[in-house]
């Protein structure tokens, strides 16, 4: 028993963690959430927290991400529970919102694992990329949101007046002018 450790005691049996040792834990990451998964109770399994609803219909939403557009805001939800907060990066480039995460190779009970993903959203034309905010919940759900109406939908044209600068005097002409004027 000294060589075997149980990392978590939930549920209360030691065999729970090792009930099916040949099966890898859930490998989905960087994918969106369904609305029913946001408010469902969670299971504490291994080293991460997952919504219960994800276990039932896992194949139905593979590759999907939750995206909400309302009158007042743009909102996206992403499950990044396999990553620590310092491994997740959110940035905007022009009208693109890019979420990326990467963690180095780690040892788990099945061997070694490393993960990396990048998801890019196109922001609506009326969302100002400088006003995007990100919040990470305790169970690894990344909430990205920005108010809508921050930019004008119409293209504004600003015509800039071009002023003409006088040409610099020619050095030869300056010498001629100096000789003529006594």
Swiss-Prot record:
Name of the protein in question: Heat shock protein beta-2
Please give the Gene Ontology molecular function terms for this protein: structural constituent of eye lens
GO BP term, pick one: somatic muscle development
Q: Where is the sHSP domain?
A: 55-163
Show the PROSITE patterns listed in the entry. SHSP (PS01031)
Q: Which organism is it from?
A: Mus musculus
The protein's predominant localisation is cytoplasm
Q: Where in the cell is it found?
A: Cytoplasm; Nucleus
Q: How does it assemble?
A: Interacts with DMPK; may enhance its kinase activity.
Q: Which UniProt keywords apply?
A: Cytoplasm, Nucleus, Stress response
SUPFAM superfamilies per the record?
Answer: HSP20-like chaperones
């Amino acid at each position: 028993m000294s060589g075997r450790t149980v990392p978590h005691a939930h549920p209360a049996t030691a065999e729970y963690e090792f009930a099916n040792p040949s099966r890898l834990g859930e490998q989905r990451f960087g994918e969106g959430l369904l609305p029913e998964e946001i408010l469902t109770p969670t299971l504490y399994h291994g080293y991460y927290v997952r919504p219960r609803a994800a276990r039932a219909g896992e194949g139905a939403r593979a590759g999907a991400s939750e995206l909400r557009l309302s009158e007042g805001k743009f909102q996206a939800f992403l499950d990044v529970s396999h990553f620590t907060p310092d491994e997740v990066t959110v940035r905007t480039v022009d009208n693109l919102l890019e979420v990326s995460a990467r963690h180095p190779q780690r040892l788990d009970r099945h061997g070694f694992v490393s993960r990396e993903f990048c998801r890019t959203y196109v922001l609506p034309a009326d969302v100002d990329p400088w006003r995007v905010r990100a919040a990470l919940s305790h169970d690894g759900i990344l909430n990205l949101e920005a108010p809508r109406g921050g930019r004008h939908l119409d293209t504004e044209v600003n015509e800039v007046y071009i002023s003409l600068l006088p040409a610099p005097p020619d050095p030869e002409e300056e010498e001629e002018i100096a000789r003529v004027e006594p």
